[in-house]
A protein has these predicted regions:
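"…together with the soluble PPM/PP2C metallo-phosphatase catalytic core" -> "…together
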Residues: 1-232
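Cytosolic, membrane-interface loops and tails of multi-pass inner-membrane proteins
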Residues: 17-42, 235-266
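Alpha-helical transmembrane segments of integral membrane proteins
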Residues: 251, 259-280, 287
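Extracellular/periplasmic helix-loop-helix junctions in multi-pass membrane proteins
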Residues: 283-297
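Small-residue-rich transmembrane alpha-helices that serve as helix-helix interface/gating elements
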Residues: 294-307
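Single conserved hydrophobic/aromatic residue that forms the stacking wall/gate
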Residues: 314-323
Length: 323
């Protein structure tokens, strides 16, 4: 316990040091017509997630060196992109290379079925970017990530899948970030930036990857279902509208709630957090531990969330028509 208190204090100090550097170097996020915020805010505060894993390694040992190397690579490139925009090709090469490092750490690069590895790499990088796209309002990245990692810590209570200290240290980093970001619109001290959203996505996917490989059950991805439904259905919606997927937009469900329906950032972030917590805890404690039950639970929640998303779109369109 004392160790975790020390880690928490060190992370708070590290965040303040970063704020000083970001302020001096003018690492800021300026609002535009597609933003869900209206004030200039420090960018890149999510670097604390990378720092948190390094601090964890310093205290508990570097048990997953390839994972840490991959995280450092993808977060580092993302941080540079936060400061000076990089070509998509550079970011994708870094993301696929980092994902391959994580896969090497997971021990799956030697699998004979190369097409499964290739598909898994595409899913890993795709999911990383979907999580990144979901970082658009105060509190949503940290709050949702807590809703993923807390149930994961409960599943891993005896360290059955991965070092529990890594999960707890990451949770501490998220709590530190929440202090400065889980605030009403216009009140956040910092934003996560790509370094934060990409970094925490990489961490969560690696942790879930350990559980999936150990259990042989891919339905554990339900821990990311709320983000997955919003992110994927938004992409489908934009394709149907013939929009350029590379351009910024405000069509995610959370953006519709925050911008069109004028629901507060903290309320929307809390809603996403609570929904994912309820789904994950139900999966752990209410769903029978069988493959069939897991798939039925996943399918049911997927359908319910998809219908909810579609209804929200119609609600938003109706509101626009009234205006």
């Amino acid at each position: 316990m004392i160790t975790y208190i020390i880690i928490f204090i060190l992370l708070i100090i590290a965040e303040f040091v970063y704020f000083h550097i970001a302020d001096k170097c003018n690492i800021i996020d300026k609002p535009n017509e597609r933003s869900s915020h209206s004030t200039i805010v420090l960018r890149g505060g999510g670097i604390i997630f990378l720092i948190g894993v390094w601090v964890w390694g310093a205290f508990f040992g570097f048990h997953y060196p390839w994972f840490l190397a991959g995280l450092t690579l993808v977060a580092g490139v993302s941080f540079v992109d936060d400061i000076h925009s990089l070509p998509d090709s550079v970011r994708l090469v870094a993301q696929f290379t980092a994902a391959a490092m994580a896969f090497y750490q997971l021990g799956i690069l030697h699998w004979s079925m190369w097409w499964i590895i290739l598909l898994a790499l595409i899913v890993y990088v795709g999911a990383t970017n979907v999580i990144n796209f979901m970082d658009g309002i105060n509190g949503i990245t940290a709050g949702y990530s807590l809703a993923v990692l807390i149930p994961l810590a409960l599943v891993n209570i005896n360290g059955a899948f991965i070092k529990q200290s890594l999960i707890i240290s990451t949770i501490l980093a998220l709590l530190v970030f929440c202090i400065f970001n889980f605030r009403p619109r216009g009140k956040a001290k910092c934003f996560a930036g790509d370094v934060g959203s990409i970094g925490i996505a990489f961490i969560m996917l690696f942790l879930l990857g350990n559980v999936i490989i150990e259990t042989g059950d891919i339905t554990w991805l339900i821990f990311l279902l709320v983000y997955g439904v919003d992110g994927c259905l938004t992409i489908v919606h934009r394709i149907m509208l013939h929009e350029d997927l590379g351009e910024a937009h405000r069509k995610h469900a959370y953006q519709i709630m925050a911008n069109e329906l004028k629901i507060g950032h903290v309320k929307v972030a809390s809603l996403y957090m609570v929904m994912q917590l309820l789904i994950s805890l139900g999966f752990i404690y209410l769903c029978p531990n069988t493959v069939l039950a897991h798939w039925l639970y996943l399918a049911t929640t997927l359908v319910v969330l998809s219908i909810t998303y579609i209804c929200l779109l119609y609600t938003s369109d109706a509101a626009d028509d009234r205006i």
